[in-house]
Amino acid sequence: TTMYKLFRTLLLPVAALFAFTAATAQNVSWKSSVEHREGDVYRIVLEASIPAPYHMYDMGPYEGGPNATAIVFTPGDGVTLEGGVEQLSTPERHYDKTFEMEIGTFAGKARFAQQVKLAAAKATVKAAIEWMICDEVSCMPPDDTELTVELTARPGTAAANSTAAVS
């Protein structure tokens, strides 16, 4: 029938477009940078770009609540972690009716950092990141990624003069 053909021709591609949009909305993108602090101390900064209209949860933790953002740094040879992961961005805090608790969220961008001490001229640190994003209606399934951050000692520092082997 004509109505069926119209439905098949117009509505199915539109429905497929909405399904594709929902599937790609999860695309939080992550980038890393390295800042020299002093001597052999550096700060690895991770930045998330969060697509509108979604928000991403802060590092919590939230028992019985949303999946908080979790970042685990694994240092390679010639580098050690100094302290824990810090949130550089300030989350917006509000009471969430769904989870019945106060939670912190980021919209647009979120920045996190880990301080490290370099004992070799070059080293790598892996960052395993897990997060979840939601809008006002629903949440996407939790997602994860892993970044590898390359560190190179600044000239004139003890690490730059090190002959320690890095694998």
Predicted features, each with a name:
Residues 5-8:
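Short hydrophobic helices that act as membrane-entry/anchoring signals
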Residues 10-19:
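Bacterial N-terminal signal peptides
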Residues 23-167:
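Extracellular/lumen-exposed scaffold segments
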Residues 1-2:
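Short, Lys/Arg-enriched N-terminal segments with co-localized hydrophobic residues
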